Amino acid sequence: MKWQGKSARKPTGGRLVPARGKRKYELGREPAETLVGPIRVKKIRTRGGNQKLRLLKADVASVSDPVTGATKLVKIETVVDNPANRHYVRRNIITRGAVIRTEIGEARVLSRPGQDGVVNAVLLPKH
């Protein structure tokens, strides 16, 4: 668990005396960092007793072709580009906005795998 509350330090470096302690709603979690590999999903209990699916590994993506409007389930080969973090490319980490290479060409990921539990992407036009 990761606490996402206010810092105990001022911008000058001096200490702030907190008026209250930490609260449960200020807790966050570590990112899922979805990898390319055999599918692995983890269920997380979220606020209100709801559930969120963490996609830890994925080997297929639901890729939509904007020209024809058809959607296919295709195999993910590798991560080509990731604007979230340049080091995610060599580590093969899939996030929203990442460009992945699939069997039918390159596609941009539109879903959030760590939140939604699926990889949805749109096919990019060939240069």
Curated annotation (Swiss-Prot):
Record protein name field: Small ribosomal subunit protein eS8
Keywords: Ribonucleoprotein, Ribosomal protein
InterPro entries for the chain: Ribosomal_eS8, Ribosomal_eS8_CS, Ribosomal_protein_eS8_arc, Ribosomal_Se8/biogenesis_NSA2
CDD domains: Ribosomal_S8e (cd11382)
UniProt-annotated stretches for the region Disordered: 1-24
GO MF, one example: structural constituent of ribosome
Family, similarity comment: Belongs to the eukaryotic ribosomal protein eS8 family.
Gene name per UniProt: rps8e
Gene Ontology cellular-component annotations: ribonucleoprotein complex; ribosome
Gene Ontology process terms (BP): translation
One Pfam family in the UniProt entry: Ribosomal_S8e
Record HAMAP family: Ribosomal_eS8
